[in-house]
Regions:
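Short beta-strand scaffold segments in enzyme catalytic cores
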Residues: 1, 86-90
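Acidic, His/Gly-enriched loop-helix segments that form or flank divalent-metal centers
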Residues: 1-72, 76-82, 98
Length: 100
């Protein structure tokens, strides 16, 4: 079975800062954006938000991003724009759902 890691933003084990405090790692994990070439080292698929999918692909309206062991699900629902919407991904069959 496939394993997933669901986080708001960047996985804490991507942290490479010199200050290894709980607060520093927390701040990193909360605010750092995932890069297109970031890969989970343990084979899990990393599902994340925080960064709208338009930063990774040119699809309108915004849609779920798949790439390099990552799935981006932030389709900009917090923004009031016609191309932004809420996304949901059912992991059992990878079926996508979107708000109108």
């Amino acid at each position: 079975d496939q394993e997933y890691l669901l986080l708001h933003s960047c996985p804490p084990h991507f942290y490479t800062g010199k200050t290894l405090t709980k607060e520093a790692v927390w701040d990193f994990s909360l605010w750092t954006r995932v890069e297109p070439d970031d890969v989970m080292p343990d084979g899990r698929i990393f599902i994340f938000g925080h960064t709208p999918t338009e930063c990774y692909q040119d699809k309108l309206p915004l849609s779920i991003y798949y790439g390099n062991g990552k799935i981006g699900i932030d389709c900009g629902s917090g923004n009031r724009h016609e191309v932004c919407r809420l996304a949901c991904l059912r992991l059992e069959d990878m079926k996508e759902f979107y708000s109108n």
